[in-house]
Amino acid sequence: MARAATALVAGSLVASLSGCTLWSGVGDDADEPTREQPGPTLASGPPPAGWQDVRSPTGLVYSVPPGWEVGDPFGVDHDAGDPGSDWGSGYVTTANAIADRGYCRLGGLSFRTLVGISATALPGEARAQAESASRAMADSIDRRFTQAGADVPVPDARSIGVSGVPAWYVSLRGEVRPPRNDCTPPTIRFDTIAVSTRGPDGAPASLVFVLMSDEGEAGVQPTETIDAVVASLRYDISV
């Protein structure tokens, strides 16, 4: 798929802040807020041998096949570290990885798969962030990334665990309506994982992993590969 360099304005996906009840620590145990529990992990084991790790300053890490490029998706060489890029996910992301850059000659940023992690923790509950991001991307797939639109149902977020930390996961598919150009696949996949954390003020926040990938035609990355990339998200125990 191809994306213009100014695809979306950074920070355009904004989750609603959930109301919080302050707990004084005094009174019965029944007054204590319920601690969120992690769901099942997506990974059935470690990443495949030979894959390269992509590390985020937030402590999250994921793994990609050895042939993928790691770094700024626009190919910018930053001497002072990775300032982050908005490649169309609606987030400024760091720890980006891209598969099959430039496969389409029609111009803009073309790729088969692109992955990144939000540059900072985003305010609000993780579930709300995952669902808000998915709804916004569904709208972008329908209105911005396709010529005649797309049918993009958005499933509910499901509870998962990332290294034992509660997280919420949404995987959606946009079925592209004809006609479509040579850079638009029949199906556009978009995955979001929002990992629960806390902001500097102690309020709920989340770190967001996003992945966009082509499906449904020759030359795309295998579904098994994409699933393994998503499942590899974890906290880096070396930091």
Q: Which residue stretches match the model-derived regions?
A:
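Short, well-structured beta-strand
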Residues: G161-I237
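Surface-exposed beta-strand edges and flanking loops
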Residues: S56, P66, T94, V162, ...
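N-terminal targeting sequences that direct proteins away from the cytosol to non-cytosolic compartments
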Residues: M1-Y91, A203, S213-V239
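Conserved polar/disulfide-associated segments of primarily extracytoplasmic proteins
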Residues: A80-P186
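Alpha-helical context
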Residues: P40-P47, T113, I117, T146-A150, ...
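Residues that act as N-cap/strand-start positions at coil-to-secondary-structure junctions
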Residues: P46-P48, S56, V154, I188-D191
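Extracellular/mature segments of secreted proteins
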Residues: D28, F111-L114, F190-T192, S206
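Bulky hydrophobic/aromatic packing residues
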Residues: P46-W51, R55, M137, C183, ...
